[in-house]
Amino acid sequence: MTSFIIAGNRGTDDPTMATLPFIAAKVAHEQGYDVVLWLANEAVILARKGVADHVVGVNLVPLRDLLQVVQALGIPIWVCSACAVARQIGRPRPDLARTPRGQSARSR
């Protein structure tokens, strides 16, 4: 089976572009592909608890809703460790959002 790693690089600075990787991950998963969502650069901010609640792209579903769907589908979300540390998040991990299974977004 084909696998995809879908990369997000934009955060709250560009809500529309920040939302698109989550839409792509959801659609790819629904079409039967194995998917990983990779957050790097400014997108690592989106892994922080509560941040997605305030991100709404132009004419798009709110990121909060998409994040809930992505998590419910079990799509892994990887967060760039170096990017998170540079933005002073994720060390220790309590400020990263949790998946429904109780695992924080994985760093690779």
Question: What does each model-identified segment do?
Answer:
Residues 5-19, 50-51:
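Short, glycine-rich nucleotide/cofactor-binding loops
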Residues 18-31:
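Histidine-anchored nucleotide/phosphate-binding helix
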Residues 35-40, 77-81:
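Short internal beta-strands
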Residues 43-57:
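N-terminal beta-loop-helix "entrance" segment that forms/cooperates
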Residues 53-58, 94-98:
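Short, flexible loop segments at the rims of nucleotide/cofactor-binding pockets, characterized by
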Residues 54-81, 86:
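A glycine-rich helix N-cap at a beta->alpha junction
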Residues 87-108:
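C-terminal structural segments of small proteins and small subunits
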